[in-house]
Amino acid sequence: MSEQAIRLTQYSHGAGCGCKISPKVLETILHSEQAKFVDPNLLVGNETRDDAAVYDLGNGTSIISTTDFFMPIVDNPFDFGRIAATNAISDIFAMGGKPIMAIAILGWPINTLSPDIAREVTEGGRFACRQAGIALAGGHSIDAPEPIFGLAVTGVVPTERVKKNSTAQAGCKLFLTKPLGIGVLTTAEKKSLLKPEHQGLATEVMCRMNVAGAAFANIDGVKAMTDVTGFGLLGHLSEMCQGAGVQALLCYQDIPKLPGVEEYIALGAVPGGTERNFASYGHLMGDMSREVRSLLCDPQTSGGLLLAVTPDAEDDVKATAAEFGIDLTAIGELVEARGGRAMVEIR
């Protein structure tokens, strides 16, 4: 089979961050009866489902460590590698850090897909690493039934500038740096519903580096930050709210959306991960239409940064975002938790 005829998405049962194990099932997997190992230098572990682990070196600098990998979300091998690498590197930026090195994770069905195609995937990953200013320094590969690619990434951050997903405050405004709808558009493409004018839009967004995260970390008023990926905006916002003991009020009209996303939802281009996300987080939502639910639960691959920002820092955040070509509008706010109210409400 020629490389031109290859459609990588046909060789996997899932796609991108939509491959994630559902939060409910993950809770069961991570539950342990063993005594927890306590290390006072481990600033961020898995307690709040943050984007990466952070370890204090004791000299004012902390190490950030993360890994992320998945099955193809696009058919083009180079783009798949680039998207997977960009997505993995994003975790470093989401913690406020700068990446310094990456190693590759490759699973490949050697008897089904040519090694030349795997090389193209790896080249896409190398390209993304170069964009981030780091080396793809090594990696590990296995013969696997489905194609898998991703990175383990190491970064650094001044300890006082670490941004967590659990330290938001009531009164903070919420901002999102990329539009939602990646899962919807990629599903529409698989179903041959995608219009010509929307071809390539999702890929362009997924390949956009969240490098602004390191700059946002220098703003004191950025109280919490995370990237929106496989659990959708609802899932990652819920984790932010749970960690801080606050509730969120969202303005649906102000949430950035990819062109055509509402039309494709109406046509049924909703990925399976959307329902898994709703099953895990739907009980935290207020009343909303199926269309709104489908967008908020849409699994994002290499999605944008979600920021909780104090009102006095709003102008600084917008100005910093503009330096990276990002036009920010508040999508909602955080309020004090109150009984009888949903954790996430839509206005």
UniProtKB/Swiss-Prot annotation:
This is Selenide, water dikinase. Homodimer. One of its GO terms (biological process) is selenocysteine biosynthetic process. It comes from Salmonella typhimurium (strain LT2 / SGSC1412 / ATCC 700720). GO terms for cellular component: cytoplasm. It is an enzyme of class 2 (transferase). Belongs to the selenophosphate synthase 1 family. Class I subfamily. It catalyses: hydrogenselenide + ATP + H2O = selenophosphate + AMP + phosphate + 2 H(+). The active site is at residue 17.
